[in-house]
C-alpha cells in the first residue's frame, strides 16, 4: 500500500501544498510463542540478538504501516505526514505496534 501513498516522518513535504484531513493510525498485536520464549531465555543467559523477536517486531511494523495507509486511503489522502511508531507489551506475552500520523490531501 505504501507504493501508492507517500508516508513521511517530516512535517512538511518540500514544494507541496496540502490540506490536513486528520489523524490516521494502523495497529497490530502479535503474541510470542513457546519456541521464541525458549530461544529468548537461552539468549538472555549468553547474550546476543533474539532474531525471532526482531523478526516479529519488523513484521509488526510493516503491518502497522500497511494498515495506516489503508486508513489514509479510505479518507482520500495522498500522503501521511509526521508518521511515528509506538509499541508496548501486553500481559507479558504480546507485543503491540501502532503507526500513526496525519493524513493530507494535495492541493494543486
Swiss-Prot record:
Name of one Pfam family that matches: YbjQ_1
Gene3D superfamilies assigned to the protein according to its UniProt record, in alphabetical order: Hypothetical protein apc22750. Chain B
Entries under InterPro entries matching the protein: UPF0145_dom_sf, UPF0145_YbjQ-like
HAMAP family in the record: UPF0145
Homology family: Belongs to the UPF0145 family.
Protein name: UPF0145 protein LGAS_1099
Organism expressing this protein natively: Lactobacillus gasseri (strain ATCC 33323 / DSM 20243 / BCRC 14619 / CIP 102991 / JCM 1131 / KCTC 3163 / NCIMB 11718 / NCTC 13722 / AM63)
